[in-house]
A protein has these predicted regions:
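Catalytic Walker B motif of ABC-type/P-loop ATPase nucleotide-binding domains
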Residues: 159-162
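Conserved ABC ATPase signature
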Residues: 93, 134-138
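Conserved catalytic motifs of ABC-family nucleotide-binding domains
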Residues: 155
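Walker A (P-loop) phosphate-binding loop of ABC-type ATPase nucleotide-binding domains
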Residues: 40-44
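Hydrophobic anchor residue at the start of the ABC signature
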Residues: 148
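Conserved ABC ATPase "signature" region
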Residues: 101, 105, 110-130
Length: 174
């Protein structure tokens, strides 16, 4: 297995108005590993994730993604990962395909690259036959699958998922 450090969190702290949401957290994730950050509500999981995806700056400590500092090199770090938020990030009036096409344009994919990638992802998440229906007709699990396809669209080196199995049936969780 590749021993390249993909994520390196070192003594990370994040405080809000004197409350420590994350307190002296350290861990490493190696390339190719699947890593789950587990803990009770309010333990700082989402705060840690938001730090890794450059939405928050730590109060102290450091976090790097593929060797790049999440504070000093935030723009570069953002090109390295895909993100699937806990909250739905889809427009109910767009079709599944339209969501992916819109994101493809935002990622500056050519129409050909986008069409190829979208076809692959719709097959992967088993939404091919539903791709041209408005998202408002999708079940909760189908919407979650579309969120995952959106996170995978830029072919990221790292995929961050916040509550990845939320709304998925048991078979889809595997």
């Amino acid at each position: 297995m590749d021993r390249t450090i993909a994520i390196d969190v070192n003594r990370l702290c994040k405080s809000y108005d004197g409350h420590k949401a994350v307190d002296d957290l350290s861990f490493q994730v190696y390339a190719g590993e699947i890593f789950g950050l587990l803990g009770p509500n309010g333990a700082g999981k989402s705060t840690t994730l938001r730090t890794l995806i450059t939405l928050l700056h730590p109060t102290s400590g450091t976090a790097t993604v593929l060797g790049h500092d999440t504070v000093r090199e935030a723009d570069l770090v953002r090109t390295l990962f895909g993100y699937v938020p806990q909250e739905r990030a889809i427009d109910r009036f767009l079709t599944g395909r339209e969501h992916l096409e819109l994101l493809g344009a935002l990622y500056h994919l050519t129409k050909e690259e986008a069409a190829k990638r979208i076809a692959e992802l719709l097959k992967l998440v088993e939404l091919e036959e539903h791709a041209d229906r408005p998202a408002k007709t999708y079940s909760g699990g189908m919407k979650r699958k579309l969120d995952i396809a959106c996170g995978l669209l830029p072919n990221p080196k790292i995929l961050f998922l916040d509550e990845p199995t939320l709304g998925l049936d048991v078979q889809s969780r595997l």
